Amino acid sequence: MKLQINAGPLKGNVTVPGDKSISHRALIFGSIAEGKTEIKGLLKSQDVQRTLVALRHLGVTIEESDQKVIIQGKGFSGLTAPDSPLDMGNSGTSLRLLAGLLSGQDFPVQFFGDASLSQRPMDRIVIPLREMGARVEGQGPKHLPPITVLGSSQLTAINYQMPLASAQVKSAILLAALQTKGQTQVFEKAVTRNHTEVMIKQFGGEIFQSGKEIRIIGPQTLKGQSLTIPGDISSAAFWIVAALIIPGSAISIKNVGINPTRTGIIDLVKKMGGAIELTDRDDINQSATIHVSYSKLKGTRIAGEMIPRLIDELPIIALLATQAEGTTVVQDAQELRVKETDRIQVVTSLLRKMGADIEEKTDGFVIKGKTELHSCQADAFLDHRIGMMVAIAALLVKTGEMILNGEEAIQTSYPQFFKDLESLQHD
């Protein structure tokens, strides 16, 4: 599509869709809890729909309306074998979490996905789940999808040292551990988003955490709950960056999740000199309104334990860095290479095509700013965050037309993205 996006400031208020990570987990926990779960604010997107449909195939009754989703929980013992392989589409979260869950069930399940998901390594979940006693098989040494899981109701508790920082791998182990007799311990390489741990407690379960060590004793029984899901800070990040880099912009993003394991971008913006403020804090739902406006920014270094707190925001942060004075260095982010696409390679290629001074590194990039960007033809590469990064970059282009191919990838996490963009341009 040709991006008919006019340069000019963004102004007004916007509410981003429900948090994608929490939405997946809310559906799963509502299904394995006993009794009714009511969810408000669930993200209605392609990825989350994959999890919802898969749970229905596992025998769970889920009713959807405009305002809420109601799940009649089956408990762990109430899940049933699906009558066909489960289609995960583009959703690595769906596959990894459901594989962990179904490792504790006594029936076989096959998972498959689209071309992008079929290139994403699943060895990271295969190894610990096999150690617990499940039979898990993928394709080749990296265990690419399709994946077959033959679980067991007699899994063994393990002590597992995580070789990489991954909330999805951690969550897969914890979902299996909830069904496993004895104490399972997980030692994280770096602290990652803790939505699974929070949700275990919300649903009446017990989990113990001290720094990077997590302990869980199973088996456990969970009880249905009422949940309200805040807006996704990873989606809000696109408006945060747009407001910071487009002169005259000032926007407020309402009801955004501010779980401390996810707010790396807020800390980063402050470090770079950006004008950002939080109001209307809700400590129960861990949400707030984020106010952000155009700012003169300076380059910085992003590395170490900051990376897991903003891993999904790094494509749009790279665009932000092109508009900051000085050098920005991103290190320790090699996980970007196994996302929906190789985000290090793709971000470097696209921003360089637009005129940015960016150098690709094994584990990140080096970006020198500030640079003026120009129009080009770009592809989303089946990656929603790449598609939205290109759309925000188009706001900076003063001449020519930006063309984005594969914009439908944005449906993965933010179906009303272009509608919200138009609203902020005409507020």
UniProtKB/Swiss-Prot annotation:
GO molecular function, one term: 3-phosphoshikimate 1-carboxyvinyltransferase activity
Subcellular location: Cytoplasm
Active site residues per record: D312 (proton acceptor)
Pathway linked to the protein: Metabolic intermediate biosynthesis; chorismate biosynthesis; chorismate from D-erythrose 4-phosphate and phosphoenolpyruvate: step 6/7
Keyword Cytoplasm (UniProt): yes
Cellular component aspect of the GO annotation: cytoplasm
Binding-site positions, 3-phosphoshikimate: K20, S21, R25, S166, Q168, D312, K339
Keywords noted in UniProt: Amino-acid biosynthesis, Aromatic amino acid biosynthesis, Cytoplasm, Transferase
Function: Catalyzes the transfer of the enolpyruvyl moiety of phosphoenolpyruvate (PEP) to the 5-hydroxyl of shikimate-3-phosphate (S3P) to produce enolpyruvyl shikimate-3-phosphate and inorganic phosphate.
Protein name: 3-phosphoshikimate 1-carboxyvinyltransferase
Native source species: Streptococcus uberis (strain ATCC BAA-854 / 0140J)
Lineage: Bacteria, Bacillati, Bacillota, Bacilli, Lactobacillales
